[in-house]
Design a protein with these regions (language model features):
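Alpha-helical transmembrane spans
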Residues: 8-43
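A short, sequence-level motif marking secondary-structure junctions
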Residues: 11, 69-73, 132-138
Length: 154
């Protein structure tokens, strides 16, 4: 093709070729990793010993831990408001990191954006959005937290 020749006899040509090879190999390695991340479900767990905490995981990696005593409000939504990523991942089936939402401002997400139920947890430190492995699990965890807090469901 036009302009695709590289003179490998020069240092500049060798460096250009090395950069291209590294870029191609990196793409081949990163693609499958992102595919695995996208299809690994986010999950929620309640840790009850020694203190009660809501823990958010992606695969085996713990992403967020929130003591129940720090939670000021819990709500379950059936749709996710529009969000713009500040930093983190926004794959087709997994969002994690800091995002901006219209009414909440900066929030922290660890969820599957294609889920049917979303758990919104508000603390003094910020707002967090999660999903469990299933919609039923998300709702059950919300009910348990509300009972634990002594808060009435809306």
């Amino acid at each position: 093709g036009k302009g695709s020749a590289v003179n490998l006899a020069t240092l500049r040509g060798k460096i250009a070729m090395a950069v291209n090879v590294i870029a191609i190999v990196s793409i081949l390695l990163v693609g499958p990793v992102l595919g695995v991340l996208d299809h690994t479900p986010a999950r929620l767990e309640l840790q009850v010993s020694p203190t009660v905490e809501l823990q958010s995981y992606h695969g085996k990696t713990q992403k967020y831990t929130i003591p129940i005593d720090d939670i000021t409000e819990v709500q379950v939504y059936s749709s996710l408001p529009e969000a713009g990523r500040i930093h983190g991942l926004d794959l087709e089936h997994y969002w994690q990191g800091s995002f901006v939402m219209v009414h909440d401002g900066t929030v922290h997400l660890c969820l599957d954006p294609t889920a049917g139920k979303f758990l919104r947890v508000e603390t003094e430190d910020g707002i967090f959005w999660f999903t469990g492995e299933t919609d039923e699990k998300t709702e059950k965890i919300a009910e348990w937290i509300i009972e634990e807090m002594g808060q009435t469901a809306d």
